[in-house]
Protein backbone atom coordinates (compact mmCIF):
# COMPACT_ATOMS: atom_id res chain seq x y z
CA UNK A 1 0.00 0.00 0.00
CA UNK A 2 1.21 3.50 -0.81
CA UNK A 3 2.15 5.63 2.19
CA UNK A 4 0.56 9.03 1.61
CA UNK A 5 0.38 10.29 5.21
CA UNK A 6 3.89 11.71 5.14
CA UNK A 7 5.65 14.43 7.08
CA UNK A 8 4.45 18.03 6.48
CA UNK A 9 1.08 16.89 5.05
CA UNK A 10 -1.84 19.04 6.19
CA UNK A 11 -4.70 17.03 7.70
CA UNK A 12 -8.05 17.68 9.34
CA UNK A 13 -8.86 15.96 12.62
CA UNK A 14 -12.20 14.15 12.63
CA UNK A 15 -12.59 12.91 16.20
CA UNK A 16 -12.07 14.18 19.72
CA UNK A 17 -11.48 17.54 21.29
CA UNK A 18 -9.90 19.07 18.19
CA UNK A 19 -12.35 17.70 15.62
CA UNK A 20 -12.57 20.01 12.62
CA UNK A 21 -9.19 21.60 13.33
CA UNK A 22 -6.31 21.64 10.87
CA UNK A 23 -3.00 20.04 11.73
CA UNK A 24 0.27 19.08 10.09
CA UNK A 25 1.92 15.66 10.39
CA UNK A 26 5.28 15.77 12.16
CA UNK A 27 6.11 12.06 12.33
CA UNK A 28 4.14 9.02 11.23
CA UNK A 29 4.17 5.49 12.64
CA UNK A 30 2.63 3.30 9.94
CA UNK A 31 3.08 -0.02 11.74
CA UNK A 32 2.41 1.31 15.21
CA UNK A 33 4.59 1.06 18.31
CA UNK A 34 4.70 -1.23 21.32
CA UNK A 35 2.21 0.88 23.30
CA UNK A 36 0.02 1.88 20.32
CA UNK A 37 -0.35 -1.12 18.01
CA UNK A 38 -2.17 0.77 15.26
CA UNK A 39 -1.05 3.25 12.63
CA UNK A 40 -0.81 6.72 14.14
CA UNK A 41 1.08 9.95 13.81
CA UNK A 42 2.33 12.91 15.80
CA UNK A 43 0.59 16.10 14.69
CA UNK A 44 0.82 19.78 15.55
CA UNK A 45 -2.23 21.87 14.82
CA UNK A 46 -4.11 25.06 15.41
CA UNK A 47 -6.34 25.15 18.48
CA UNK A 48 -7.28 28.78 17.79
CA UNK A 49 -7.02 30.40 14.37
CA UNK A 50 -5.84 33.98 13.74
CA UNK A 51 -8.63 36.54 13.36
CA UNK A 52 -9.28 38.67 10.30
CA UNK A 53 -7.17 41.83 10.23
CA UNK A 54 -8.56 45.04 8.73
CA UNK A 55 -6.69 48.15 7.63
CA UNK A 56 -7.91 50.50 10.37
CA UNK A 57 -6.70 48.21 13.18
CA UNK A 58 -3.83 49.56 15.27
CA UNK A 59 -0.50 47.73 15.36
CA UNK A 60 -1.31 46.40 18.84
CA UNK A 61 -4.69 45.06 17.71
CA UNK A 62 -3.18 43.56 14.55
CA UNK A 63 -0.56 41.75 16.65
CA UNK A 64 -3.29 40.40 18.95
CA UNK A 65 -5.42 39.22 16.03
CA UNK A 66 -2.42 37.47 14.44
CA UNK A 67 -1.90 35.14 17.42
CA UNK A 68 -2.51 31.41 17.18
CA UNK A 69 -2.84 28.67 19.78
CA UNK A 70 -1.33 25.26 19.08
CA UNK A 71 -1.66 21.67 20.14
CA UNK A 72 0.62 18.65 19.81
CA UNK A 73 -0.99 15.24 19.85
CA UNK A 74 -0.69 11.59 18.84
CA UNK A 75 -3.63 10.70 16.58
CA UNK A 76 -4.88 7.43 15.10
CA UNK A 77 -4.88 7.33 11.27
CA UNK A 78 -8.61 6.55 11.38
CA UNK A 79 -9.26 9.99 12.90
CA UNK A 80 -7.50 11.99 10.18
CA UNK A 81 -8.63 13.30 6.82
CA UNK A 82 -5.65 14.08 4.59
CA UNK A 83 -5.73 17.13 2.34
CA UNK A 84 -3.86 17.95 -0.85
CA UNK A 85 -1.87 20.66 0.93
CA UNK A 86 1.58 20.50 2.48
CA UNK A 87 3.05 22.87 5.03
CA UNK A 88 6.81 23.48 4.91
CA UNK A 89 7.35 24.15 8.61
CA UNK A 90 10.21 22.35 10.32
CA UNK A 91 8.59 21.09 13.52
CA UNK A 92 10.50 17.80 13.71
CA UNK A 93 13.00 19.03 16.33
CA UNK A 94 10.36 21.03 18.21
CA UNK A 95 7.76 18.33 18.83
CA UNK A 96 9.00 14.85 19.66
CA UNK A 97 7.54 11.86 21.47
CA UNK A 98 9.78 12.73 24.41
CA UNK A 99 8.16 16.17 24.60
CA UNK A 100 4.74 14.59 25.20
CA UNK A 101 5.96 12.58 28.18
CA UNK A 102 6.47 15.45 30.65
CA UNK A 103 4.44 18.61 31.19
CA UNK A 104 7.30 21.12 31.15
CA UNK A 105 8.79 19.72 27.92
CA UNK A 106 5.37 19.84 26.29
CA UNK A 107 4.88 23.48 27.31
CA UNK A 108 8.23 24.49 25.77
CA UNK A 109 7.45 22.47 22.62
CA UNK A 110 4.07 24.21 22.32
CA UNK A 111 5.71 27.64 22.65
CA UNK A 112 8.25 26.83 19.94
CA UNK A 113 5.56 25.41 17.63
CA UNK A 114 3.43 28.50 18.21
CA UNK A 115 6.35 30.78 17.31
CA UNK A 116 7.08 28.85 14.09
CA UNK A 117 3.43 28.77 13.00
CA UNK A 118 2.90 32.48 13.78
CA UNK A 119 6.03 33.34 11.79
CA UNK A 120 4.68 31.25 8.89
CA UNK A 121 1.33 33.06 9.10
CA UNK A 122 2.98 36.49 9.07
CA UNK A 123 4.94 35.69 5.91
CA UNK A 124 1.62 35.09 4.16
CA UNK A 125 2.41 31.58 2.98
CA UNK A 126 0.03 28.61 3.33
CA UNK A 127 -3.00 30.89 3.68
CA UNK A 128 -5.45 27.96 3.51
CA UNK A 129 -3.95 26.37 6.63
CA UNK A 130 -4.58 29.47 8.73
CA UNK A 131 -8.24 29.92 7.79
CA UNK A 132 -11.01 28.37 9.85
CA UNK A 133 -13.00 25.56 8.26
CA UNK A 134 -16.56 26.63 7.56
CA UNK A 135 -19.00 23.81 8.29
Swiss-Prot record:
InterPro entries: Ribosomal_eL27 (IPR001141), Ribosomal_eL27_CS (IPR018262), Ribosomal_eL27_KOW (IPR041991), Ribosomal_eL27_sf (IPR038655), Translation_prot_SH3-like_sf (IPR008991). The keyword Cytoplasm does not apply. GO terms for molecular function: mRNA binding; structural constituent of ribosome. CDD domains: KOW_RPL27 (cd06090). The lineage of its organism: Eukaryota, Viridiplantae, Streptophyta, Embryophyta, Tracheophyta. One of its GO terms (biological process) is translation. One of its GO terms (cellular component) is cytosolic large ribosomal subunit. This is Large ribosomal subunit protein eL27y.
